[in-house]
A protein has these predicted regions:
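ATP-dependent small-molecule kinase phosphotransfer cores
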Residues: 1-43, 49, 72, 76, ...
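Anionic group-transfer/hydrolysis microenvironments
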Residues: 48, 68-70, 122
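Conserved catalytic network of the ASCE P-loop NTPase/AAA+ motor domain
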Residues: 34-38, 54-59, 108-112
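Conserved phosphate-donor/acceptor-positioning beta-strand/loop module used by diverse small-molecule
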Residues: 58-80, 93-96
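Amphipathic alpha-helical interaction elements
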Residues: 17, 21, 66, 80-84
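Short, well-ordered beta-strand core segments
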Residues: 43, 61-66, 116-118
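NTP-dependent small-molecule kinase module
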Residues: 3-8, 13, 76-84, 101-152
Length: 152
């Protein structure tokens, strides 16, 4: 069933903030995510608290990114993703509320890790974001494993 859901839909987004505040729900999800990460040694994780919570202690991560985008640009992009089915004003309000609640959440609030690479997505297009990420990944992996490092 979950494979047929659009996890980035407004309907799902409306419930995420409420669920993210529930300590027990976060614990269950964290255990599930850590299990998947242990099973797959090379994995790319995406989420608002992957580096600060899920990967914080063990297993360690090679590269972490913290994406920052101004509310106006983020709202427009989300509105286009939703095929303009919801008023832009509502999308903007929803994003503002979710970000504020995530940052002020008692358990594992949204924050940038000290070693995370900040990427300002409001001033870059997708291609530029990917190029910047790729450059940072190469730099970190070469620094950690040496110039002869080759991904499997």
């Amino acid at each position: 069933y979950i494979t047929r859901l659009n996890l980035h839909s407004q309907e799902i987004s409306n419930h995420v903030t409420f669920l993210a505040k529930q300590k027990k729900v976060r614990q269950i999800i964290r255990i599930f995510q850590k299990k998947i990460i242990r099973q797959h040694h090379q994995i790319c994780c995406e989420g608002r608290d992957q580096a600060s919570t899920i990967l914080k202690k063990n297993p360690h991560y090679d590269v972490a990114f913290y994406f920052k985008c101004n509310l106006k640009t983020a709202s427009l992009r989300r509105w286009h993703d939703l095929k303009k089915k919801i008023p832009l004003k509502e999308v903007k309000k929803s994003l503002r509320t979710r970000t504020l609640l995530d940052k002020k959440r008692r358990h594992n609030p949204l924050k940038k890790m000290a070693d995370a690479v900040l990427i300002r997505t409001d001033i870059l297009n997708k291609k530029a974001v990917i190029a910047k990420m790729s450059k940072e990944i190469d730099k970190k992996l070469i620094s950690k494993y040496g110039r002869n490092f080759k991904a499997r």
